[in-house]
Amino acid sequence: MTNIIFDTNAARDFVAGVGLGELEQYAENIASRFNSKGLKLSVSPVVIQELLYHLVDSNDKDFSVSFKAIKAMMLVQEYQRKDGVHAMMSPSELLIANEIYHMRSESRELMYSQLMTIAMVLSHGDINHIPDLHTIDGGTVKTYVDDIESGFATQIREVCQSVEFMSKITGKSFEEELNTEATEISIVTYFSRTTYNLLMNEGKLPDYHLFQPPFLSDDDERLRKYMWFTDLMMKGNKEIIRRYPAFLKLFKEVIRRIHKSNNQISGERLKNYVWDISLMFHVNDHTVNHEPFRFITTDKAMLLASGAFRNSNNVMNYGEFHEWLMQNDEL
């Protein structure tokens, strides 16, 4: 089977022109067509989270289409699986926790599980009865997403400015400096630190704040712990770079665009990139669970420019995908 992954905008395009009362039949028809072509819809909680963001306020301009996108995707998956089980693709934090630290973040697993449960409830409900949209920490989905997006926009600008500064110091071109190991480690730290903090808050990893510099002359134990921490982070970051090249390439492409715009690219535009980059963790070794995939997007040009996809057949604009899906021939 070939996995089909929608990014958030493609998920909205997926239900464009479909009425609320037509969603169930539409989803059943799409599931049948997917099956006939050997396709399997894979739903990311990252996309569900972005769509739920627009359901917090019924006056949101994307309220209706986001509801329809969630309902249609969940129903397609349900019709395809026929076992009542909704598969959840692991977001970046869970992948890093499991594959790099060999641990589980139960708190984050629970949060994503709750989001997928809400999506499942929505798939059998109606648009006038939206369930409570709070995350595990008590904040709304909107608050959580806003915080992540704002932090990312600030962080990626800082990385870009650091690359620009270092290129002046070293005499290297911007592109050469962007591709140094030091820059790649800086980029990856954005994700690895998030996961470390999650595991730290669950008591599974030590609180690094307790052994940060400066050190006194008799601080041998704190120094030893600090060296252990930095070694753990360095090894983990290098392993993330090795295992997940697609996310790193897209991250770099966004940095290039900031640089080329003279840092004039808007904050609103930057914020949305964090979710696109997060989705790239799903395409580890250019498969999904060792099965082929097609990534359906509204920004194919950028993904191809980044080099995240070695095979251009693995990424399609939604229009291309829809046109092919409605044909009877093979891909």
Where are these regions (language model features)?
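Short, hydrophobic beta-strand segments that form beta-sheet elements in well-ordered domains
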Residues: F293-T297
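Active-site-proximal, substrate-binding regions of enzyme catalytic domains
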Residues: T2, T8-E291, A301-L331
